[in-house]
């Protein structure tokens, strides 16, 4: 029985029901947030553990285990940048370049401003042989963080693999200027120096790289390459050529040279390169237009020695010097110009050059043999004199990229018959294919002038020569095969000769048999619009130990 004073429960109002519903939603949201946080902490903990395990596996070079660990972790935590970044690096280290590049592209689509992953992407491109595509990516990463020396080293390596040795050398040297204890930068500079023909400099840089903890595998490869470059070689060969000595529009002597030679190379104290060559050549010049009892202007036997030293360890400053001696003897007394009392010739060569960023200034001097057909002042008889051509030149080369090269030269030459020549020239080349075989086109323009004409050698006055060429060259590691071919068209105008246009082709092939027997062949041939033909062949073989 209900008391009159006891009130019955009132039904809930709409406002009260809304408050109850909001409270319930708050409890549910808080529970879900706590559950998500707990799950995130668990996922983060698992991701961190996966990173630790994968890094340890990578340190052991167990890249397959590292990759599988990271892939499992990414299934539970697909947005984790650290997991994805390490996976991209592991795939690159294990040479799965396509997968690595795809992973990096996913990363950079999410985080385009990440310099670290941008550099990793560039590195994977370079390692996979796409150095051309890697270079702009490296530049973007460096623009985002120029203090990362590892990125700049990767950039320099990509430049070198792309053929831009000038740019690579300059970048490695900038890294070394920032940190002289960076072993990998010294190692990269060592490789570039060797590719520029300076193995003694590479040897010095490699030792610095080793002292500063450079990559051991890279050190081993560079040391093996230097050891191969230092191996002494000795060999023999044969050369033959036919040239034209044009002295007027109606006179073109035929100059022929044939004979064997022996040569050798060695490195003294891992510091100075040395080369020597001894040859025994037959030289003669024919005047086919003379209706006399002989068409020989001269007929000589030459015994020649040449020795050269190069001083390349002080890279980027380089120097070389050499001396040559020739002894002549007459082979045939029935000649128009018999050999006189002077039977010896001494020549020399010297060059100094340096790599200054993308510029290469140079200076040089040479003295080369040239046969002078003269008249004896005392007797009035014809006589052949072993004359000399002494030249000095200044040059400047510019390598703005892997594709483009330009150079210019100023030279002054003096002949023993009181003649002189001044020449100014320049050329430019463009490499339109950098894969093997490499293809390049070039164009050169040269102006020159002699003090006077000569009956002994070609003396075009106030001449302008245009030359355009196409060159193909390549290298194959199998058999250390080095090959190339070139075609050139040249056109020359002068004040004392009719216009001359010449087509010239040349080829070379060098290889190594059984790892220690280098063999080589070189040949060229030309024909001009006056039907004058020239050719030359050189065969060589040597042993390396």
What do the predicted segments below correspond to?
Residues 35-42:
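Boundary at the C-terminal end of the N-terminal hydrophobic targeting segment
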């Amino acid at each position: 029985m209900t008391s009159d004073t006891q009130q019955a429960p009132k039904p809930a109002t709409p406002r009260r029901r809304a408050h109850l519903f909001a409270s319930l939603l708050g409890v549910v949201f808080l529970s879900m947030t706590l559950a998500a946080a707990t799950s995130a902490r668990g996922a983060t903990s698992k991701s961190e553990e996966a990173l630790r395990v994968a890094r340890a596996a990578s340190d052991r070079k167990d890249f397959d285990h590292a990759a599988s660990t990271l892939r499992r972790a990414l299934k539970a935590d697909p947005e984790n940048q650290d997991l994805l970044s390490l996976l991209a690096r592991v795939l690159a280290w294990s040479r799965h370049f396509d997968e690595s590049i795809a992973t990096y592209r996913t990363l950079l689509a999410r985080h385009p401003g990440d310099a670290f992953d941008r550099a990793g992407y560039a590195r994977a491109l370079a390692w996979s042989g796409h150095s051309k595509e890697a270079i702009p990516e490296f530049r973007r990463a460096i623009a985002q963080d120029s203090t990362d020396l590892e990125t700049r080293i990767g950039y320099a390596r990509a430049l070198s693999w792309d053929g831009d040795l000038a740019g690579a050398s300059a970048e490695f040297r900038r890294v070394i200027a920032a940190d002289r204890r960076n072993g990998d930068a010294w190692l990269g500079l060592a490789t570039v120096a060797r590719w520029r023909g300076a193995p003694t400099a590479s040897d010095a840089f490699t030792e610095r790289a080793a002292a500063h903890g450079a990559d051991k595998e890279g050190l081993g490869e560079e040391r093996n390459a230097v050891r191969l470059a230092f191996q002494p070689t000795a060999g023999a060969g044969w050369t033959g050529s036919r040239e034209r000595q044009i002295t007027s529009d109606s006179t073109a002597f035929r100059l022929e040279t044939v004979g064997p030679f022996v040569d050798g190379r060695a490195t003294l104290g891992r510091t100075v390169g040395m080369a020597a060559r001894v040859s025994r050549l037959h030289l003669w010049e024919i005047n086919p237009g003379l209706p006399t009892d002989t068409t020989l202007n001269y007929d000589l036997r030459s015994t020649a020695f040449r020795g050269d030293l190069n001083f390349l360890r002080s890279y980027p400053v380089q120097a070389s010097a050499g001396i040559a001696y020739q002894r002549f003897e007459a082979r045939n007394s029935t000649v128009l110009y018999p050999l006189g009392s002077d039977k010896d010739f001494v020549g020399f060569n010297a060059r100094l050059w340096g790599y200054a960023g993308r510029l290469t200034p140079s200076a040089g001097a040479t003295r080369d043999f040239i046969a002078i057909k003269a008249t004896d002042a005392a007797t009035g008889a014809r006589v052949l004199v072993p004359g000399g051509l002494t030249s000095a030149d200044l040059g400047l080369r510019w390598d703005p990229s892997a594709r483009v090269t330009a150079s210019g030269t100023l030279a002054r030459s003096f002949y023993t018959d009181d003649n002189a020549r001044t020449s100014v020239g320049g050329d430019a080349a463009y490499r339109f294919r950098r894969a093997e075989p490499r293809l390049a086109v070039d164009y050169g323009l040269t102006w020159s002038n002699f003090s006077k004409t000569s009956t002994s050698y070609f003396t075009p006055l106030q001449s302008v020569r245009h030359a355009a060429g196409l060159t193909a060259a390549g290298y194959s590691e199998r058999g250390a095969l080095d090959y190339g071919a070139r075609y050139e068209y040249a056109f020359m105008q002068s004040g004392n000769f009719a216009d001359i246009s010449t087509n010239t082709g040349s080829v070379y092939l060098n290889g190594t048999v059984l790892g220690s027997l280098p063999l080589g062949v070189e040949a060229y041939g030309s024909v001009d619009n006056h039907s004058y033909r020239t050719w030359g062949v050189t065969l060589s073989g040597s042993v390396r130990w």
